[in-house]
Structures are given as C-alpha cells and as structure tokens.
C-alpha cells in the first residue's frame, strides 16, 4: 500500500513537471514527504528540467538509421548550435533512433512514455529531462518517422551539414541497391523536390501555378496561351517533382530515367516508393 495520497502525487507533478512513474518512486522513497520528494527528484536531475521547457529551440539535429527493424528518422531541437554538437546530446539523439526502431513507434507523445533503450529505469521523456539538466538547455523532440521493413526494397540515407538536413529514399523492386537509393537521397538534398511525381502535386498547388502563368500572358489568343501554360507547367514539374528532375550527378538523365535504367538492368520494375526530406526547423 502506498504511503502517500493522490493529492500529494498531483502536487509533486505540478511542482516538478516530472512524469507519474518517477513521482511515485520519489514519494515512496521519501515516505510520502512532498518536500523531500522534490529534493530527491532534483538530485536525479529531473525536477529543474521543467523550468527550461518554455525556452525556444531553433537548432538541433536530424538522425536516421535503417536496418532489419525498419527505418527511423528523428528531429530533436535545442537552443544553440553548440549543444546541437555536444556529445551527450548526440548520444541521446542516437538513443531515440534506437527507441523508434525497437518500438516501431511513429508518434512523439507515444515515444515519450516508452522505456528508454539507454536507461530502462527511465522513460524517454524522463531521460530527456536528465539530458536537459546535463547540457543546460531545453530539448524538444520535434518529430519522428518510422518506416516498416518490407521485402525487396532498398533504403538510402544522406545527411548534410552534420545532421541539419537529411533525406531518405525507399526504392521498391530492388533489395540490394542502397548505393542507388543513397545517390537519389543526395540528389534530393541538393535539388529540394516537393513532390514525387506530377500525379502527387495537389490540385490547389497546380491551380495556383496556372493562375500565376495566366496572369503573365493575358491578351494572347487562347491557343497560344494554352501552349505557353503547357510549356511553363513542364518547367514547374521539373523544379518540384523528384522524378522529373535532372539527376544531380548526371544532368543528361532524369531521376525517372535513372530508375528506368535500374529496371532494365534488373529485369523487373523498380520504383521510388517514397522519399523524406527534413530540414531543421522546417
């Protein structure tokens, strides 16, 4: 039977901002004494971390990993670039990638409540608080992504600027071409496509582009206008659609052409299943 009331537990959580499990542990260790429990949590480096939660986080790092468990991408933000390159912070981020892969989780709130792979006695959120205490800055897990591992696919990851920008490319129909997938990921970081192909461009974005083009060519015959719009839309698609872009390592071929060559070599259909492009703060 617990030696503390629910009201005391509630007060401890309000005063410290620490998770339920650790608050229960603190009160149990301190025989239900609220003040001693606060001190107990402070010694663990948990209580004071909540005071940093309001601080703005514009810097950080994006980390990604792919293995037999799937593919994980995480973005974690801090206040300064100095801490973003701190070894303790980087270790915490690497641990988060492992947590996402181990638990196959795709939601930040759910991840925060799970046991940390770095310290099973702490939840991910509690370890975040401990790490905040160590580095002296607010830490915010901005977003995470988990992609399940499936058969006959290749995943390529490219990181630029020490984790400021990361791209992931998933190729289907090919199981041993991580180098090709990585080349495409490198291209994505350089060319910054917004969409996979023409078909994935939203109707509203396409309508806006047509409106902009039309406003520039008023007063011409409709047949001429239609031809100009078609040509300019082709340029638009080349700018924003991955498969329409000229390959950064060989501009004589598009990404779609590169995929077609891989399909021909393999004797089966190879496709870009999906891609991710994350930039810090974007």
From Swiss-Prot:
Main location: cytoplasm
PROSITE patterns listed in its UniProt record: EF_TS_1, EF_TS_2
Compartments where located: Cytoplasm
Single GO term (MF): translation elongation factor activity
SUPFAM superfamilies membership: Elongation factor Ts (EF-Ts), dimerisation domain, UBA-like
Chain intervals for the UniProt region annotation (Involved in Mg(2+) ion dislocation from EF-Tu): 80-83
CC terms in the record's Gene Ontology section: cytoplasm
Assigned keywords, A-Z: Cytoplasm, Elongation factor, Protein biosynthesis
Taxonomic superkingdom: Bacteria
Keyword Oxidoreductase: no
Transmembrane segments: none
Listed InterPro entries: EF-Ts_dimer_sf, Transl_elong_EFTs/EF1B, Transl_elong_EFTs/EF1B_dimer, Transl_elong_Ts_CS, UBA-like_sf
Coiled coil: none
PANTHER family per UniProt: ELONGATION FACTOR TS, ELONGATION FACTOR TS, MITOCHONDRIAL
Function text: Associates with the EF-Tu.GDP complex and induces the exchange of GDP to GTP. It remains bound to the aminoacyl-tRNA.EF-Tu.GTP complex up to the GTP hydrolysis stage on the ribosome.
Database matches in NCBIfam families: tsf
Family the UniProt entry places it in: Belongs to the EF-Ts family.
Stated name of the protein: Elongation factor Ts
Gene: tsf
